[in-house]
């Protein structure tokens, strides 16, 4: 069984929840074309929604850079720093839980960033939707796109690296 853990911000823990539902055999997802790839092959160790810098640092024992923008209690970075932070969080999560695959997401101003870290490779990508957390622009569109792109990438990794079909 392939172990997975997520520490998510702009995807609100939805990547991990979707993987968990398929892994556990939720009937409403049985018709999904990727159900058979995940069910019986993957389990979720943890799926966390971590919007704050303090929460991430406390739980994962990692020191993140100071946010580029002030936004209530949540962290908000530039596109460049979102990529850096996504990598840092995925590495900290993988080190902490010793899972096979660690997934992290973060988004401030820009397209956000997702890092999927496996035992062999690091995959870093953005959503296809520009959003601005500070101004509240395109937040839900970016989230939906990031969730779908992350899940599709996760499935492709299972096929490519783990030979699942």
UniProtKB/Swiss-Prot annotation:
<protein>
    <recommendedName>
        <fullName>UPF0254 protein MmarC5_0742</fullName>
    </recommendedName>
</protein>
<dbReference type="Pfam" id="PF06787">
    <property type="entry name" value="HcgF"/>
</dbReference>
<comment type="similarity">
    <text>Belongs to the UPF0254 family.</text>
</comment>
<dbReference type="InterPro" id="IPR009625">
    <property type="entry name" value="HcgF"/>
</dbReference>
């Amino acid at each position: 069984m392939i172990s997975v853990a997520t520490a998510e911000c702009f995807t609100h823990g939805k990547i991990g929840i979707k993987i968990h539902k398929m892994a556990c055999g939720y009937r409403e997802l049985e018709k999904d074309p990727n159900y058979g790839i995940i069910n019986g092959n993957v389990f979720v160790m943890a799926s966390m929604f971590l919007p704050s810098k303090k929460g991430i640092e406390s739980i994962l024992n990692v020191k993140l850079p100071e946010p580029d923008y002030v936004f209530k209690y949540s962290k908000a970075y530039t596109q460049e720093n979102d990529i850096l932070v996504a990598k840092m969080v995925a590495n900290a999560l993988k080190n902490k839980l010793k899972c096979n695959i660690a997934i992290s997401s973060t988004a401030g101003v820009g397209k956000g960033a997702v890092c999927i870290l496996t035992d062999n490779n690091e995959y870093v990508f953005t959503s296809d939707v520009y959003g601005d957390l500070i101004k509240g622009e395109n937040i839900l569109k970016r989230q939906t796109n990031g969730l779908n792109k992350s899940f599709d990438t996760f499935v492709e990794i299972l096929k490519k690296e783990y030979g699942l079909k």
